[in-house]
Amino acid sequence: MGKVVGIDLGTTNSVIAVMEGGKPTVIPNAEGFRTTASVVAYTKSGDKLVGQIARRQAVINPENTFYSVKRFIGRKQNEISQEIRQTSYNVKTSGSSIKIACPALDKDFAPEEISAQVLRKLVEDASTYLGETVTQAVITVPAYFNDSQRQATKDAGKIAGLDVLRIINEPTAAPLSYGLDKQNNETILVFDLGGGTFDVSVLEVGDGVFEVLSTSGDTHLGGDDFDQQIVEWLIKDFKQNEGIDLAKDRQALQRLTEAAEKAKIELSNLTQTEINLPFITATQDGPKHLEKTVTRGKFEELCSNLIDKCSIPVNNALKDAKLEASSIDEVVLVGGSTRIPAIQQMVKRLIGKDPNQSVNPDEVVAIGAAVQAGVLAGEVKDILLLDVTPLSLGVETLGGVMTKIIPRNTTIPTKKSEVFSTAVDNQPNVEIQVLQGERELTKDNKSLGTFRLDGIMPAPRGVPQIEVTFDIDANGILSVKAKEKATGKEQSITISGASTLPKDDVERMVKEAEENFDTDQKRRKNIDTKNQAESLCYQAEKQIKEFEDKISQDLKTKIEELITELRSSLEKEEYENIESISQRLQNSLMDIGKMAAQAESKNTNTKDDGTVIDTDFSEAK
């Protein structure tokens, strides 16, 4: 088995790590950073950008720059009304599925495809770092992700060319790195507030066993929502003062979003900061500028409802674990949004102790995923991870009621069965609707899928015995089987249909990704070639100027002609010519070095004219 990596596929940033020498190590990306922005963009010329380079050009290309896509993965139209308002790109629906419009390519992407581009970037950079091709991974998801979102994450990995060995919960991964050396039993509360999701898990950790006691969360709450509070405040204030609604301007909205995120980050260390956005818009009277001072107090006031919402899953997780706050030994903070002072104060108030600050909240999840990857690869011994299912699972029964078969916070993998019967006499079949959620009625829970069991023997209602078995694997992905005991007839469903992508679409996307791999690599190579050539032209002009009096006129003319020829090929994007001309220019620059060295040597020899200066030296006393 080759190297198995651990990946934290985040809303804002993503991280990849691996076990090296028995220790988990974060792998830097090609740009040298330990985190990679979860941003994908397409330029007008069709070039794909991933990571920080994509984020940097978002203001000038808002409709083709896709960020926070994790908030849409595995979701249906009726689940994203809040998130749609926060993007500068166009999110639309195709049936019940979500699509992201890319005007630059005149194409629609599934969220899984965009996430796959981020995964591909992480894996390619890791393969270069490790010197071997990475094909297997453990990927983390928020603990409160439902079955659809988990399956969609797995699909994204598949589209990226990965064999996803395990999907594990983010707040479960975090203690794997934190508690690796713990010998004594401790009860840990993991508070995981990321860019787009929020989870709280309570675990028992000690002697290599990591047992999740409970988990709770909110997949509609994260750092993006804190940014949005600032954005809406700025829009409202600008409209009152200038009479202009910036919400209708995509470019202005993107600038506001970036400025809000920057202000939020700065207010974690400062008590106030300035937001200055010159030329935010223009009218007939001329350009308009936005200048605003934001204090930490104002930020906390704007976000007070979000901060209050964070306390609910904490209380729920403690209640489900049947623990008091005083029973918690350690609080581990995960996710960049936990740097907000008001969040840290709220956690301290609820639990009664200072959070543990020894872990890097941006990296701890990926490090934990790498530990789990090491377990699966056989590199790490004596570690046992006992995770739970975050939401109850059941079926619809008579009257539109959800009957729970597996309660939330059940340790996985698990398998449970219940026996049901028919509702009317001589009923030939039953339709089984699989549900996930905590509400009592079917309509208030999420439907994961429906299947039908035919061939039931004619009998009075209540006589046939239909055994429904729920089986959850270690990834938290569900399969359901129904069996009529009298006839032995059975029908089953693996809830992969819960993914927003049909199997055919996933396979098509995998094929497209493979087919486009060479094209993408060629584009990347062309961009690198172009950048190197432009740099070479600059260096050549600089050297001609610097050594003008030390090189021959013929060499100077030759280099100037090569620069002109190279710039012409750059303009026409003739990449083969660019490479050959660059090589010739490089050779000529070496000639400059030789001539300059010869000229320098000649000057040194000329200065030594053999004259002897007659003088006396006195002896040093």
Curated annotation (Swiss-Prot):
The keyword Nucleotide-binding applies. This is Chaperone protein dnaK. The keyword ATP-binding applies. It is found in: Plastid, Chloroplast. Belongs to the heat shock protein 70 family. Its main location: plastid. Keywords: ATP-binding, Chaperone, Chloroplast, Nucleotide-binding, Plastid. Residues 598-621 are annotated as: Disordered. The gene is dnaK. One of its GO terms (cellular component) is chloroplast. It comes from the Eukaryota. GO terms for molecular function: ATP binding; ATP-dependent protein folding chaperone; unfolded protein binding. Acts as a chaperone. InterPro entries: ATPase_NBD, Chaperone_DnaK, Heat_shock_70_CS, HSP70_C_sf, HSP70_peptide-bd_sf, Hsp_70_fam.
